[in-house]
UniProtKB/Swiss-Prot annotation:
Monomer. Part of the FGAM synthase complex composed of 1 PurL, 1 PurQ and 2 PurS subunits. GO terms for biological process: 'de novo' IMP biosynthetic process. Substrate binds at residues 82-85, 104, 230, 302-304, 525. It comes from the Archaea. This is Phosphoribosylformylglycinamidine synthase subunit PurL. The active site is at 32, 83 (proton acceptor). NCBIfam families: FGAM_synth_II, PRK01213.1. Mg(2+) 2 binds at residues 105, 258. Its main location: cytoplasm. GO terms for molecular function: ATP binding; magnesium ion binding; phosphoribosylformylglycinamidine synthase activity.
Amino acid sequence: MDLNDLKFIEEQLGRKPNDVEIGMFENLWSEHCSYRSTKKLLSMFGKTVKENQNIVVGPGDDAALIKIDDETDLCVAMAMESHNHPSYIDPYNGAATGVGGIVRDIISMNAKPIALLNALRFGDINGEEKDKVRWLVEGVVDGIRDYGNRIGVPNVGGECEFDKSYDYNNLVNVVCIGLVKEGDIVTGKAKETDLTLILVGSTGRDGIGGASFASKDLTSESEGDRPSVQIGDAFTEKCVIDSTLEACATKKVKAIKDLGAAGITSSCSELCYSGGVGAELYLENVILRDEGMTAYEIMVSESQERMLLAVEKGSEEEIIKIFEKYELPVSIIGKTTDTKRFFVKMNDEVVVDLPLDLLCEATLTDSEEKETILETPDNKENIAEPEPAELNNILLKLLKSPNINSKKWIYEQYDHEVQLNTVVRPGKDASVLRLKEAHPKALALVADCNPTYCKLNPYGGSLNLVCESVRNLATVGAKPIGMLDNLNFGNPEKPERFYQIKKCIEGLADGAEIIGVPVVGGNVSLYNETVIDGKDYPINPTPVISIVGTIENINNIPKGAKEGDILIITAPTKDEMGGTEYYKQIHNTEEGIVPKANLEVEKEIYSKVCELVNNGLINEAVDCSKGGLGVAISKLCMTNNIGVELDLGDYNTNGLRNDILLFSESSGRIILSVDKNNADKVVKELNGAIIGTVKGNELKIKLNDNELINLPIEEMKNKYENAFSEMMGENI
């Protein structure tokens, strides 16, 4: 613990804290738990939630809750977390427990978990660390697969990207959503005194110090922190899910908290402090899985599959019997009080006596910032081949590249069909889940980020990110109702990193406000930075966002492009090549100006595309982002197993070079496939441009009389779908 913090605590207490109390402060005042560096910045998101009548529970609880159907009072619970450091040290258990923790956040609101997403970042899979990267990929995917499949929650989508900035700090961000009726919601606030505190699950030494471990840079000695990584048990988690929801159905449970970072210390203090009450605990009643555990170890253990319940006095036996039926360890460990203090005894010895406001309100840090915008004017003379004559091989190379190729190697290992609600499966721009309780409504989910854009221009890259996510939702006709953010950055004590954090948050907040989607929760993960031989290796700024949207009628989502369809694009392509996959993969550079997003135009485009989809006028829709028009139209062909003929002569009003026309990642573009009879109506509504037709079994692109692309769809699919296995060193 910082000596200034310790001095402040001593002054406030009027005494020196004991070792147990110091351990509690060290964990709760860690960056991971307290957001000391970012709490002031996160207040910028407040403007996005004002006067939104559908937000039932906003930021601050284990999960946000948004009403999605007035007739049934149905609400969607949504939460997002990271498990970055643990997943680098122990990829299997780090990723598995990341899934377990986010699912418990959802059941903490008495919501049934219905879907998972994951956003993964790894190092350069073709670089010097490729063997380590492959090992990490396998471990993380195995952990997510085994845990998610065994608890019966479908993993319906996400993203996976590679960059050398993640060589020493991979990222594992997980999203979970659930459903609950408004009248059945339970929160994490114990607002009454004399409630009985019941702990579900046994406590061991695994994960001790996990919160403080996640709040510092990794070093070459970090392998020694393996004991800080929690160990998960998916079968126990399944029992915890079912039993907790059953206990809540009694209406005797007044508040719940998952035991995550900092264990009992965090869950109990947050549960009581947020409700304005105190807590009195008896540690001898905590069921232990390891002998001889000290009070400190019990208070900060991060053993998995544990829940803390505050229940009505007199209902203890009824609640305990429910958990015993599932053969879960369960015991009464304390009660809520009117003292607003955290009082803990162990075998009649007082081991903790602290004011909750001091424990739960860490002093905030004021970090210095230094402007760090790396984008430069686009100097095409520095590129070896300013205008390549042959584009077929370039398109194939992009389709095979790590950040564009099919991730079926990953998602086909996940059970995305369990619960039988998945309508649009992984591999598309957005995942779609049917709502049996509110048919014909449906939910759509996305998770997105473009770290390269955010490195070059933190503010502009974050604006672009919001727009891309909303366009992805528009492809299935979904209206965005709530946004989560997972802010992954390097060391905030370094001015360049803090500037990136600040500008990315500004960009996300401004983008969300203009588009009209409230930011209802999220997570901050800092210190994703490694020091080796005195040199810093920070990750690229990676503000991953996940947006949930509602679809009014699931029957109108696009069913797929078909022969004879007309292809329409919603916006022009511009000379904006900075940070594009084309520049990175073909020319090994990230220079240039990143694409600029016009938020008002984007809002109009997504609104009109949503309306057209909901009116049943769109057969297929594909967002143009990574890889530009060339990759987007390729995905349309491969997904629908159809050919396309494009003529971009009339569309190329900016007179762009051929490679820029195909691979620029200009914002605002969605490719639509529509019936011939509806084409004029759609073009007029969107002020879009007709660029071609669905025809044959090849992708043919020309510019007036100049043929740019001519490729068989089967050849494209072979490259696109097999590339990931090849990257992992598997023989095809």
